[in-house]
Amino acid sequence: MSVRSLPAALRACARLQPNDPAFTFMNYEQNWDGAAETLTWSQLYRRTLNVARELSSCGSVGDRAVILAPQGLEYVVAFLGALQAGRIAVPLSVPQGGASDERATSVLRDASPVAILTTSPVIDDVTQHVSAQSAGPAPSIIELDRLDLDAAAGSGAGTENYPATAYLQYTSGSTREPAGVMLSHQNLVTNFEQLMSGYFADTDGIAPPDSTLVSWLPFYHDMGLVLGVCAPILGGYQAVLTSPVSFLQRPARWLQMLATSSHAFSAAPNFAFELAAKKVSDDDMAGLDLGNVLTILSGSERVQPATLKRFADRFARFNLQEKVLRPSYGLAEATVYVSTSRPGQPPELVEFDAESLSTGQAKQCESGAGTQLVSYVLPRSPIVRVVDPDTCTECPDGTVGEIWVCGDNVAIGYWNKPEESERTFGGKLASPSEGTPEGPWLRTGDSGFITDGKMFIIGRIKDLLIVYGRNHSPDDIEATIQEITRSRCAAISVPGDRSTEKLVAIIEYRRRGDSDQEAMDMLVAVKREVTSALSNSHGLSVADLVLVAPGSIPTTTSGKVRRAACVEQYRQQQFARLDV
């Protein structure tokens, strides 16, 4: 389907396949076994137009409409209605205290919305939170479930005069206050075409017509929004959705949805693969077959090869093919997608000498002797280069640098942050190679390298640990620890003696043992095993291993570890240690 915007794609779907199911939401709060709620394309389009009409009296084209609603079909309709009305949609999670409140407060202050789209079950929390923001005129609060969304839409609902920015995707804020990435309809349509070309490279970017997008990812994060809401509309595919809470309550629900949907295409962060491999039983999968699954992409956080292997091995008996697992790299500033692994084969894992990587050079080594990294296709679109961030020159093959991205999927910039936008989105190459544009380039802040025509990602540059003058990826260190503890952990560096940095690891640990002495013995054994593994695999001596209760490590709303907050809590001795 060739369209220029998401509203145009929705209109086309409603015209071409009005009575086909568009979105099905599995409500496990209403029924433990799941109650299916389905909208056809014509119903979805009618509800979208009615929300747009309601918004037409709130501000004007280009004003912001924030969605603060639980995961469900109302959220989908709210997002689409805002776009249809020419308002800039701002997807958010319902404020529930703590970090979520701080995030919502920051976004509401930054976006200055004219309207809040919500539902009656959460109206009290939303109203209380919005009322506490005193700056500027109060936004209109619209309860979607109190509107007659199925009324005849008539004409005049919405606009064709769309603003340059379609929606603001606020970053998770793991290292700073959330920033609103300004994404256009062109960004979205382009990135959809790019990701289809990547995942379906062997079929000219075309998925089977009966493909189903299956997702439990939150709509307020980039991967959940694009996969769960936008991609089904842009491709004309059915979506079967549920909530993150429903997945966390019972991970088997995700696998069951994959097995019962035709040609399922899904996505999840690394922790979900680990959780599913550990928690889903054979009884949960009785009578189910995963042989029809098209793709399960792993993204949003560092892909751990060992986790994917455990997942593939666990569900092989239910005919899951390892080749459908597709490690993927992307970021909100590039809409969502940049690259994935090669199609038609299992993820390719390559080992590199850890000592060489710490000095900025990639040298392959024998299996089991180094750092294992996933290989990604070096895409034609978008254009990707590895660049020396100091000289702005392209790095030679095998040299570690910063990943830069150029293409029509790259966002306009950050909302209300011109200086940060210029730093991030205004990269210019010095003496670019033939066929490589000078700029503007998106500076991703991620380190990586290219070798043999393949791309490898190391991690966030800001998160790199410098220990005794060498660079170490916290993701690699955490992966080593997690192979022992199978729990969340954070590798951080803190100032030591004589202006050096020392390595500290914070590890969430569930106490085991029948007596206090047995529990302490097991805890000491874990610390000994972790210390040995870090020495053998990374040549690192750990200055302090801090074992804490599950849930102690600060994270973002998407589950990423907030390492800067960990450093501060450690320095202030705020972690309640289990090992003292």
UniProtKB/Swiss-Prot annotation:
Alphabetic keyword roster: ATP-binding, Fatty acid metabolism, Ligase, Lipid metabolism, Nucleotide-binding
Pathway: Lipid metabolism; fatty acid biosynthesis
Stretches the record annotates as Disordered: 423-444
Pfam families on file: AMP-binding (PF00501), AMP-dom_DIP2-like (PF23024)
Database matches in InterPro entries: AMP-bd_C (IPR025110), AMP-bd_C_sf (IPR045851), AMP-dep_synth/lig_dom (IPR000873), ANL_N_sf (IPR042099), FAAL/FAAC (IPR040097), LCFA-AMP_ligase_FadD28 (IPR053437)
GO cellular component: plasma membrane
GO molecular function, one term: adenylyltransferase activity
Coiled-coil ranges per UniProt: none
GO terms under biological process: Actinobacterium-type cell wall biogenesis; fatty acid biosynthetic process
Catalyzed reactions: holo-[mycocerosate synthase] + a long-chain fatty acid + ATP = a long-chain fatty acyl-[mycocerosate synthase] + AMP + diphosphate; a long-chain fatty acid + ATP + H(+) = a long-chain fatty acyl-AMP + diphosphate; holo-[mycocerosate synthase] + a long-chain fatty acyl-AMP = a long-chain fatty acyl-[mycocerosate synthase] + AMP + H(+)
Record SUPFAM superfamilies: Acetyl-CoA synthetase-like
Enzyme Commission designation: 6.2.1.49
Knockout mutant characteristics: Deletion of the gene leads to defects in phenolic glycolipids (PGL) and phthiocerol dimycocerosates (PDIM) production.
Gene3D superfamilies given in the database record: 3.30.300.30, N-terminal domain of ligase-like
The protein's role, per its UniProt record: Involved in the biosynthesis of phthiocerol dimycocerosate (PDIM), a cell wall-associated lipid found only in pathogenic mycobacteria. Catalyzes the activation of long-chain fatty acids as acyl-adenylates (acyl-AMP), which are then transferred to the multifunctional polyketide synthase Mas for further chain extension.
Family to which this protein belongs: Belongs to the ATP-dependent AMP-binding enzyme family.
Protein name as annotated: Long-chain-fatty-acid--AMP ligase FadD28
